[in-house]
Amino acid sequence: MRLTADTFRSLYLEYGPRAQGFFMRMTGYDIELSRDLTQDLFMRLWSIKDRYDSQLPFNAWMFTVAYNMLRNEHRRQMTVMEYVSSVDKEEPVEVPERLEQEQRRSMIHAAVERLPEPQKVVFLLRYGEDLTINEIAKVCDIPEGTVKSRMFSALNAIREYCKLNEKY
């Protein structure tokens, strides 16, 4: 597929919200920064549209560029923050199940926050963006085996954190 202005506009409408969601999770839910990064991402994609390999799904290419943008920002001292939004402390709890669900969510959020960046990125791309192992490998430019081992380590670390911090 050749990326014309019309096809690119359609791709922006389809994938722009996913890109912004990815940036939201990776920047601690900073809406303005996420919007700016999404705009920068699509400007970058347009400027390098001739490099797009139509054999790959567009979202894999898009997340590759997005991941590299974040990596470059990180090198400039920007830290990757939240995956799951914080629980609003002032929000009343309606039922015990909701409280339990929010506590689990908060615990997982804390566990994800403590992951080393390589594990966190793999985890977020898999569970936040629903990319396959193969797509994550392409996005991060690492072998599939490395993706699997990072995912295994991330899941074990999250599981261990939750076991240690579970309240009875």
Where are these regions (language model features)?
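Σ70-family region 2.3-2.4 aromatic/basic alpha-helix that recognizes the −10 promoter
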Residues: 16, 39-46, 56-79
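A short pre-motif secondary-structure segment
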Residues: 122-126
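DNA-recognition helix of helix-turn-helix
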Residues: 134, 140-164
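Short, small-hydrophobic-rich alpha-helical interface motif
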Residues: 19, 23, 34-45, 65, ...
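Internal acidic/polar
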Residues: 72, 80-105, 132
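A short, charge-rich alpha-helical start-of-domain segment used by transcription regulators
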Residues: 1-21, 35, 46
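C-terminal flanking helix
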Residues: 16, 20, 42, 116, ...
